[in-house]
Design a protein with these regions (language model features):
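Active-site regions of oxyanion-processing enzymes, predominantly non-cytosolic
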Residues: 213, 217-228, 250-274
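Metal-dependent active-site segment of extracytoplasmic phospho-/sulfohydrolases and closely related
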Residues: 60, 293-334
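Functional beta-strand-loop-alpha-helix junction segments that form "active/interaction loops"
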Residues: 119, 210-249
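Hydrophobic membrane-insertion alpha-helices, especially the h-region
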Residues: 9-21
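Active-site His/acidic residue clusters
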Residues: 150-155, 232-240, 257-266, 270-298
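N-terminal catalytic scaffold of extracellular/periplasmic and nuclease hydrolases
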Residues: 21-217, 223, 321-396
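Positively charged n-region of N-terminal signal peptides that target proteins for export
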Residues: 3-6
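Structural motif
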Residues: 52, 180, 227-229, 268-272, ...
Length: 396
């Protein structure tokens, strides 16, 4: 407990030092307050674009694994300009699932495990994507799971149970996302609607281009477009998925940036490293590392975009930690030369551990300290959509 308090205190002090160093004095002075009480520095650029990267199941140990294996200072995570920690509990369980956590990150509201895009009473909870669409902003999602899975679904769907994949898919086909890349073709080719019209046909009727092969990404220049690149989830990295996530992220950014410019608006893109979680459920350390390396390349693509486009905020976080991953020494005698390290999992499920938030780009100094996942979501809405209400009172 004492060590935990020391670590948290160090994180807060580092965040304060960074905020003062870049001129975000107002943030530093109020750092001991809840994020809902923080006012932005007047000399900071407004946040126009949000790139929201979610490593499903990614805890601090998963990031540490990447850094240890890649060499400190070489990963996209090392480029972070600010950091925070978030709690992940759901409305009915201290250990969340991806549906409840995704709903919190997308909508600013807690819900029960298994519930997606709805409040505990099953009332629809509007996501930041829906808010952005109403404001005329292009939006998109890029994942390595099915597009109907919990995290992406939280940004556009409303169902009482996360495994209602066909119902979620039917809602996807009726959504106003500008770009969506992932798996889930088998659901897009079917329907539970009374008219029986498959989602793919509905999308085409609505003017969407529909892709089924990742090689078609190179042919794109604008949306609306949805790509369903596998019947279910895309393959594991070990099974040849290649650089799909990075390529799809870069293509989505290209399309959204162009359309945002034409509309004189910003954009929001959510990118998920979906299969970090799946490999951690399997307690597959090599698989986790491969998925983390893949996600790291997508994070780097987002940061590179932010470097070229002032007004872009990159937020990298997780919905929860999976596997209870620890990294002990292979030798308990630390006074001798290192004998190596080990990667050990304590569970095949999720844990209640806090997860990290890495921030980069415009507005990165405004979020720091220890907060809840819903508070992070409220801050992001306020930064990207300031006309939606004061951060101290955002009830919607």
């Amino acid at each position: 407990f004492v060590m935990k308090k020391i670590v948290i205190t160090m994180l807060v002090l580092l965040s304060a030092a960074y905020a003062v160093g870049i001129g975000g004095g107002e943030v530093a002075r109020k750092l001991n307050l809840r994020p809902s009480q923080i006012v932005p520095a007047a000399d900071t650029l407004p946040v126009r674009n949000l790139i929201y990267l979610i490593g499903d199941g990614m805890g601090l140990s998963h990031v540490s694994m990447l850094m240890l294996e890649e060499g400190y200072g070489t990963t996209a995570f090392d480029r972070a300009q600010n950091i925070a920690l978030i709690t992940t509990y759901s409305a009915n369980n201290r250990v969340t699932d991806s549906a409840a956590a995704g709903t919190a990150l997308a909508t600013r509201h807690k819900t029960g495990n298994g519930m997606l895009g709805v409040l505990p009473d099953s009332t629809a909870a509007e996501s930041i994507m829906a808010d952005a669409i109403r404001a005329g902003m292009p939006t998109g999602v890029v994942v390595t799971s099915t597009l109907q899975h919990a995290t992406p679904g939280a940004f556009y769907a409303h169902v009482p149970y996360r495994r209602q994949y066909q119902r979620i898919s039917d809602q996807l086909a009726g959504s106003d996302l500008t770009v969506a890349f992932g798996g889930g073709l088998k659901y897009a080719e079917a329907s539970e609607r009374e008219d029986g019209v498959p989602g793919i046909e509905r999308l085409r009727d609505r003017g969407f281009r529909v892709l089924t092969d990742p090689s078609q990404l190179d042919t794109l220049s604008r949306g609306p477009v949805m790509g369903f690149f596998a019947d279910g989830h895309l393959p594991k990295m070990s099974e040849g998925r290649g650089d799909y996530l990075e390529r799809a992220t870069r293509k989505a950014l290209e399309i959204l940036s162009r359309e945002a410019g034409e509309r004189d608006r910003g954009f929001i893109l959510m990118v998920e490293g979906s299969q970090i979680d799946l490999r951690a459920h399997d307690n597959d350390a090599e698989g986790v590392l491969a998925e983390m390396r893949d996600f790291d390349r997508a994070v780097a693509a987002a940061m590179d975009f932010a470097d070229r486009h002032p007004g872009t905020l990159v937020v990298v976080t997780a919905d929860h930690e999976t596997g209870g991953l620890s990294i002990p020494s292979a030798d308990v005698d630390f006074e001798h030369e290192e004998a190596g390290i080990e990667y050990r999992f304590s569970t095949g499920g999720h844990t209640a551990a806090m997860v990290p938030v890495y921030l980069y780009g415009t507005g990165s100094e405004r979020i720091n300290g220890v907060l809840d996942n819903t508070e992070l979501a409220r801050m992001l809405k306020w930064l990207v959509l300031p006309d939606s209400g004061r951060i101290a009172n955002v009830p919607d």
